[in-house]
Amino acid sequence: MRVKHKPWAKDRLEEFPAIYIKNPEDFKGRWQEVFGNNNPIHIEIGSGKGQFISGMAKANPEINYIGIEMIESVLVSALDKAIEADVPNLRLVARDAKLLEECFEKGEIAQIYLNFSDPWPKKRHTKRRLTNPTFLTIYERLLPKAGEIHFKTDNRSLFEYSLVAFSEYNMLLTFVSLDLHNSDYEGNIKTEYEEKFSAKGFPIYRLEAKFDRN
């Protein structure tokens, strides 16, 4: 999807330092200071326009959330939703997922959300998929032993690829749904994409997984 460039996005984000963290590397290992508490930290990689992460922060005040989106012109929409939600447990960061280890210490993140990530369908772009083993290695370092990855997509090919990638990485699949909205799963908070695709009748695929470190 092509994103309309918003030249004013960076300045707009920087107007709200209580929400937008301009230099997340400065807080590596010190994110508890940012939030002012010791609550667990959950991150969403590729948070887009922010509907999911804002909804999660509002529904779970006992958890700290960080929405990560590399495109500032998109992240500025997430900022607007964060302002509207008016929650103290949400921060936003503009960074590429490849740089996460520069922003977070080992084991500092309790849970990772991957929602409707770019499927990168061409074979030569496989390594760009956020469920590629290269990224799984990064996630494994960021998560504690009990940490989990929650993944949602409407793209069956990406879901099947991810199931295989997680399994070959010796991860434990603790939840798998091939049609989330017609399952017994409760507490689902939809993303903008999720609302769009489910309204057209597409099934939503979801899984939960954790690293097997026994």
Curated annotation (Swiss-Prot):
Q: Which Pfam families match?
A: Methyltransf_4
Checking SUPFAM superfamilies in the record gives: S-adenosyl-L-methionine-dependent methyltransferases (SSF53335)
Keyword tRNA processing found: yes
Q: What is any one of the record's Gene Ontology cellular component terms? A: tRNA methyltransferase complex
Binding residues for substrate, per the UniProt record? 122, 154, 191-194
Range of residues in the leader sequence: none
Which GO molecular function annotation, any one, does this entry have?
A: tRNA (guanine(46)-N7)-methyltransferase activity
- What is the main EC category here? transferase
The EC code for this enzyme is 2.1.1.33
- Which InterPro entries does UniProt cross-reference here? SAM-dependent_MTases_sf, tRNA_(Gua-N-7)_MeTrfase_Trmb, tRNA_methyltr_TrmB_bact
Stretches of the chain forming a coiled coil according to its record: none
Q: Which parts of the sequence bind S-adenosyl-L-methionine?
A: 44, 69, 96, 118
Q: Which reaction does it catalyse?
A: guanosine(46) in tRNA + S-adenosyl-L-methionine = N(7)-methylguanosine(46) in tRNA + S-adenosyl-L-homocysteine
Q: In which pathway does it act?
A: tRNA modification; N(7)-methylguanine-tRNA biosynthesis
Q: Which CDD domains match?
A: AdoMet_MTases
Which keywords label this protein?
Methyltransferase, S-adenosyl-L-methionine, Transferase, tRNA processing
Keyword presence, Amino-acid biosynthesis: no
> Which residues carry out catalysis?
118
Report the sequence similarity comment from the record: Belongs to the class I-like SAM-binding methyltransferase superfamily. TrmB family.
**What is the stated purpose of this protein?**
Catalyzes the formation of N(7)-methylguanine at position 46 (m7G46) in tRNA.
Please report the name of this protein according to its UniProt entry: tRNA (guanine-N(7)-)-methyltransferase
Query: What is the scientific name of the source organism?
Result: Listeria welshimeri serovar 6b (strain ATCC 35897 / DSM 20650 / CCUG 15529 / CIP 8149 / NCTC 11857 / SLCC 5334 / V8)
